[in-house]
Amino acid sequence: MALVVATIFHWKRSQGQVESARQGLKARQRAVAQELAPRWLPMRQAVEAWTIELGRGAEVEPFVDAEAARHWDFRDKAGLYLRLSIEQAADVAAIRAGAKKSLRDGFTACLLRAPNESPLVGKECARTRDCGVGESCNELDRCARPAQPYNLRVAYRSLQVLSDEWVRDTDNAAGELELRMLTSSFEDTVRDDLPIAVDLLTRAQYFLLVLDEAPSGAPPVVGDAGVGDDAQLTAPHWARVGLWRLSDRKLVLRMRTEASATLVGGATVTDADVAGARQRQANSCALAGAVRRVIEGADAQPAP
């Protein structure tokens, strides 16, 4: 009997400690949210609304703000970037799921003039804490200064601690070990990732969006396949591009054009993966060239 009583007492004591730790972690999260949510949530709401708007309907009315294009060259400025399939622009949930796999690609490299260093030159890392001041641990597990434009995938990941989902995960943590893991992740994010994310979001002057349509005859992208669906980007396809100036929420560019290029010359490539990567790069650069021509004064290409 004494053993049973002792066991119950120990269990209740452990549960009390877990609950105390849970409430302490949630209090720390509320303090962070109180400071950062007013900066992040309005911007997130704006870019998600723009993304849904650009993806809506079968037609896209071409638009260029001539004055902004003439006097405000965004290509050497700090900005935000997101690339999704058009199916992932259907609603907020789809955008957030797709953003988890959105990466910088040949489109930004060919369009913008940001002096980014190679993502492979830094030392190996497991998390941002392993890197120097101003550096983060990138998707290649290398320390590097955040590249421009800043991919919204990283912002969504870093600022996940402000979300209702994070609070639910904390409420549902079953025991001490799970709560310790959440606490450790929270501390790493607050110490290492949030300062960089907030700085880049604060400095951003534009939002650049690409929505890839499915190639003719191809099945639509579903779930969180995102721009990582290589087959979609390798084939010729139509894409929608939007550009917004963040200071006044002004639409600067809206267009739909074909992302398609023919590789000419060079050595014959027999490796299918290498050939596919080259074709994706060429298609993305062709898309960037079309955007550049519109910005420089050409008419937006009408939809077929």
Q: Language-model features: where?
A:
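Hydrophobic membrane-insertion alpha-helices, especially the h-region
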Residues: M1-H10
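Short, disulfide-bonded extracellular cysteine-rich repeat modules
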Residues: G134-P146
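Short secondary-structure boundary motifs at beta->alpha junctions and helix caps
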Residues: S247-A298
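Surface-exposed short loop/turn segments
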Residues: Y150-L152, L159-Q160, E165-W166, G175-S247
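Disulfide-braced loops of extracellular cysteine-rich modules
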Residues: E124-S136
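Short, solvent-exposed mixed-charge patches
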Residues: P302-P304
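Extracytoplasmic/secreted envelope proteins and their assembly/folding machinery
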Residues: R44, W238, A288-R292
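A structural "domain/chain start" motif
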Residues: H10-G122, R145-E178
